[in-house]
Amino acid sequence: MAAINDLISQIQDETLRNRIQEEVSKMAKQKKFGLVFEEHMPESTPLYDMPIKRGCNVMRRDSKDDKSIYVVLKVEDDTAACVKQEQKDEAVTFELKDIVRVAEFGESIYPYLMPVDSVCNAPDSDLWHTLIEADNYHALQLLEYLYAGKVDCIYIDPPYNTGAKDWKYNNDYVDGNDAYRHSKGLSFMQRRLKLAKKLLNPKDSVLIVTIDEREYLRLGCLLGELFPETHIQMISDLINRVVVAKDNEFGRSTEYIFIVYLGSASPAKLPLEEDWNHIENSTKDGIHWANLSRTTNSRRQDRPNMFYPIFVTRDGKRIAKIGDPIPLGQDRATVSVPSGCVAVWPIHTNGEEGRWMQGKDGLAKLVQKGYVRLGRFTDTGMAISYLNRAQIQKIESGEYIVSGYDESGTVIVDDSTYSATYIPDNLWNIKTHDAARNGTNLLSSLLKEKRFSFPKSLYSTHDTIRFFVANKPNALILDFFAGSGTTMHAVNLLNAEDGGHRRCIMVTNNEVSADEAKMLKDKGYQPGDAEWEKLGIAHYVTWPRTVCSIEGHDVNGKPLKGDYLGSEPPMHMADGFKANVAFFKLGFLDPTAVSLGMRFSEMLPTLWLKTGAKGKCPELTGEQMPDMLILPENQFAVLINENTFADFAEKLAEHPEIQTVFLATDYEVNYQSMVKNLNVANAY
């Protein structure tokens, strides 16, 4: 509707414009069912580092009053003559400093990654994380080329659309008076989630999305529409332990975590702290002997083959024999009992005939292994118990220690050292998930001032991700709403705890807050200016937090105080993490230069990411383009001049660790010919 209203406003005939507006308003008020929103809300991205030239699309830098997209007719000195896309008969002249080139959604783009900075605190490790400063839609387009179907876990904390001007849509802040803010939020998320779905491993991966009560209903419906083939679960996580009272409504203490399970994905059973143990869960207990006699839905006639005698010696210490099932109608008293034995039948306390939980042959195998235990004689027979499949698995896996066998042949299990592993319920009341203490205060200890509102608790993010990557030490984890950088901090903590090699990619824009934007504009600065950009979230929050947490100091260089919670042995924050991160800014290449093959150096970081970001990202020095690159430390190679293929193949043979190559050629037949002569796993 927003796009239609913009078009209606451009109708010159006032009578016609008013009639059309009236009819459209009637349509908008009609009752609709299901999740209905404006899916085609206009959205574009400013390209501050792209030159303005004839034929490109531009917007005014201060687009609050004029969000129109203009087409540049000509550039002369410091001005550009432009026309609106819809009205090409009225030319307008702008100063170049007042406009910015933009990319509309659906427009062909040529992204590249420009190195900004890096931190290397593990020079001997080939593991490198990545932070990308970008509009996340365009970053996801690039990542689709790099990692389609390869991501194990996506964790995102998108803007909650509170109406407090805490996020931007189409280069403008969205506030609570915006009639289309829900459509903008859903359209914004829909576009990005469609791309995110392509990145996830369809056989085994998860999408994790956190949200509050304002948008969880809409988000849940959207996820259901976009992922109809999956199972979706919602967790309630207590994140505010000090609730601020609100007038005429309940205080907010929780947020919600949607988990979208793809393929065979499931949470891992983990050893958990006492906070998780707030409801009864049998999987948390030690060794459990189950009653062999079923107590419910257990009449003899329901399973006749489960009604048979167990012959126990008169002293009650040993099973001498297991009898055969008797047919329905036969009186159990007619069964002969071996000398020196007592026949034990599955009889309920009310005297009714029941059935055993195991068939004759299955029980015999359990007895042979010592997995059946005899109790005392009772009025109706004897209490007999056994170990079920889950308990036996814990014995055979070594979780329970068998210390011997008693005189009846039953195993003696030592479960004193057993640490219960289990999947908790979906109501999390975990002290470490407190966003104030372990989010806001933790971030302030790194940055020494408040630079970001409502950061996540490090441990809430850590725990949520851990359920799905605990058994994936080489998992690829993506967060394309990186915010303050909690996700990478959590991944580094996970790797430090269990020696994992998990890799994290974070994407964030470099927006400033609404208040900061006003302050900067009052001083005469505009987006793209250095003074503006240095206060953006990527440079002012995400990257400093990443560097400080890895190197173990605050922004002033002073060692961090305290230990990470729940780690054994204690992990000191001042020790940092053995981790490396490369920081890039997503830029856009001129299509003409790309077609002429003039911008290879800018493409190198993309190729590095394509091959798994192993080792430090290589750089080309000098203007001379080499014929080839052989990069054993990065485990890939590039042939730039196909006329040197023979030399390339010879050098490549010296490095069997290189299993990925990129071959530059204009002809498919040449590419196929070269690939046939290379012994590598991947060629592009």
Pin down the residues of each PLM region:
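Conserved proline-anchored active-site loop of SAM-dependent methyltransferases
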Residues: 149-168, 477-491, 603
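Active-site-adjacent bridging/hinge elements
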Residues: 162-171, 428-443
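Active-site-adjacent structural elements in folded domains
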Residues: 181-182, 444-450
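Conserved SAM-binding loop and adjacent beta-strand
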Residues: 448-459
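Conserved helicase NTPase motor core
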Residues: 124-162, 166
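Accessory, often C-terminal, charged low-complexity segments
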Residues: 1-123, 128-129, 144-148, 152, ...
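Short, glycine/acidic-enriched loop or turn micro-motifs at the edges of active sites
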Residues: 138, 160, 215, 482, ...
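Aromatic- and acidic-residue-enriched carbohydrate-binding clefts of CAZyme catalytic domains
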Residues: 164-180, 515
